[in-house]
Structure formats: C-alpha cells, structure tokens
C-alpha cells in the first residue's frame, strides 16, 4: 500500500486535518500518516513513498528530514517555492518533486497591492498612533501615477501587472526570460536591474531563488533606489542581502519595506526587522489564505490520480524528475 506522509506544521490544525481527510476520502487505497511536529516524523518518514509538505515547513531541518526519506518517490510541495527541497543533497535522486505553480496569482497580487498601499499610506504610523490614542493627520502618498517594478515575470506577475495598470501605475517588468505578457509598459532583462532600479517607486520581488538570484538585491542595487521608494519581497529571503537592506532602512536610503520572506524562518525574535518603524512584516503568508486548500485540491487530486495510475510522465508541475 502506498504510504503518504502529511507534514504541514505551520498550517492551522484544521487545515492539516482537512488535507488528510481529502486524501483519505478520494484515495482510499493509500495509507495516510500525519506528523505535526518534527519528532512525530520518525515512525513514518523512512517508509513514506509520498511526502506532502511546504518547502518552508522543512526549513533548517530539510536535510535531516529528506535524508531519512529512504523510500520517497514523490515530494508534493503545496507551495510554489521548492528550493528548500530541491537544493537538499540528501533528497534521494529517485524522488520527483512537484509544486503548485499557477495557483497563487490572485492571493499574491492582493498581498503585493496591500503592501504598496500600506507603505504609501504609512499604515505602521497609523497603527502606532492608534495604539497611543494619538490624533495625527498627514498627507498620504498615492500609488496611482507611480512606477512599480516587478522582478520575476511568471504566473503571479501575469495577474499583478494588469492589476497595477488598472490602478493607474506604470509597470516595468524585470526578467531573465524573453516573455512579453500583457499588463506591462516595458520589460527589461534581469542584467539591467541596477540600471533601472532608480526609476521605481515600488519594487516588488517575485523571482525564484536560484544561484543567479541569491543576494542579487545587494547594497549596490539598494543604493541606486530612490530614497522615496519601497521594497516589497514576496519571493524568498535569500534574494535580498538582509544586512544591506537593514542598513538601507536604518539610514533611510529607501523609504520602507514590506517583507514576507526571510533568510531564516521563523524570524528570530531579536532580529532588527521587528523593531524598525519603516518595515511591515508578515510570516511568509503572502499566498496563504482561508481558502487555500480548496484552491490546491484540483491539482492535488489530478496529480495523485496520475501517480497512482502509473502515469508519471503526465503529472503536472514537475520541477524535478526522478532519476533511475
């Protein structure tokens, strides 16, 4: 019997149960095991054929967890980013990896627009004033008429670009591909990032973390940004040089940042980001929402059906194929 191990420790308990119940109902021929904590993996990880998880949920324990998966044939990532999985040398070569590419356009677009509006209208300042019962009126900035740079032109950007245009923004795409989707006034190659960064009022990072993008937003790039510009990172923490960003924010070389992803997650309690007045933090929930499981269910069902039927070559969103 095929054994499926569900490891989703960062999801609310109800969502974990919902995932297991769905798999049990639609695939009664498989054995479902659930682990909510690292210690609960031990009875199951060595014999599991399928691991259902988020890459970020593995975190710093990814090497240890995947290294014990001696029977793994498929890691089903319920998110888009898989660097926490595919970059782990301990993952057996016979295991294929899939993700949920294409499922996050709407929630990530909403997160990006919320971030831009909250930064432009100084929402942290409003909340601090509310907490102090302090009445202070000030002029907020508009995002209409401003230029947004979207770094990474994938499925999310295809939704975000037109949405920004609808709000009256000028949209500049930055990408390593030659794709020209609608919703962009202009698209330039990633090699020109430092050249165009000074044009931007809002810089939204959506690109995957790879060897080519690791720390690509460094001190030199940040120094070219407008002092009135905002940085929004919804992709991966490793894309931005965090010490350089901290320095730029402290010295007000940029106006502020909204950060959903970090080099170390969970973010340590003593990290400088927590106490910075020009920073908005969220705990890697840009794509996650109350209806998330409902959104990914069709793809989970389709891929499980194909896998169990032996139609591996027909599976969707395979980001790493199994090796013989």
Show which residues each predicted segment covers.
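Rossmann-like adenosine-cofactor binding region
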Residues: 178-272
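Phosphate/diphosphate ligand-binding glycine-rich loop within oxidoreductases
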Residues: 47-127
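Glycine-rich NAD(P)-binding loop of Rossmann-like domains
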Residues: 125-159, 186-187
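N-terminal glycine-/charge-rich "phosphate-binding" loop or analogous flexible N-terminal tail
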Residues: 1-50, 55-57
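C-terminal helix-to-coil terminal segments
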Residues: 98-111, 125, 263-324
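Short, conserved loop/helix-junction motifs that constitute active-site signature segments
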Residues: 63-71, 88-92, 222-227, 248-252, ...
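A short, aliphatic-rich alpha-helical micro-motif
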Residues: 41-46, 66-69, 143, 195-200, ...
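NAD(P)-binding Rossmann-fold cofactor-contacting core
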Residues: 166-183
